[in-house]
């Protein structure tokens, strides 16, 4: 399936640390983006499903910023808050209750940020 345009290209929504890294190492950032697009395009999963999976991977690794980024991207790809919450809850028996609750709270933070920025449709 062809890669869809990356909503992360809107740099107003990415963390300052990431912006600084991209500014200092643009070739690495470009390579990272090319790999991400190639991986998304290599199989039959659509962008929405890929983002839901990436939420699970990010939460399993305990990566708050990445989890919130993929929550935002999943919403932009059409995922509902209920779908995002289910993606998080699916990890409970694998990564444990505390990490699941932490990831759920990170998603709530992102939903609230999106509401404040006028990106309706959040939980």
Describe these PLM feature segments:
Residues 72-79, 95, 106-115:
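Short alpha-helical linear motifs
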Residues 85-110:
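C-terminal structural segments of small proteins and small subunits
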């Amino acid at each position: 399936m062809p890669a869809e345009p990356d909503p992360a290209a809107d740099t107003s929504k990415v963390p300052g640390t990431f912006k600084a890294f991209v500014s200092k190492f643009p070739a690495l950032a470009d390579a990272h983006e090319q790999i991400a697009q190639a991986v998304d395009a290599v199989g039959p999963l659509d962008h929405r499903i890929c983002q839901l999976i990436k939420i699970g991977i990010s939460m399993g690794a305990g990566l708050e910023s990445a989890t919130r980024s993929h929550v935002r991207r999943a919403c932009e790809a059409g995922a509902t808050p209920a779908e995002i919450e289910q993606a998080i809850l699916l990890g409970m028996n694998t990564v444990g209750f505390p990490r699941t609750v932490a990831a759920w709270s990170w998603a709530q933070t992102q939903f609230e940020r999106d509401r404040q920025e006028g990106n309706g449709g959040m939980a």
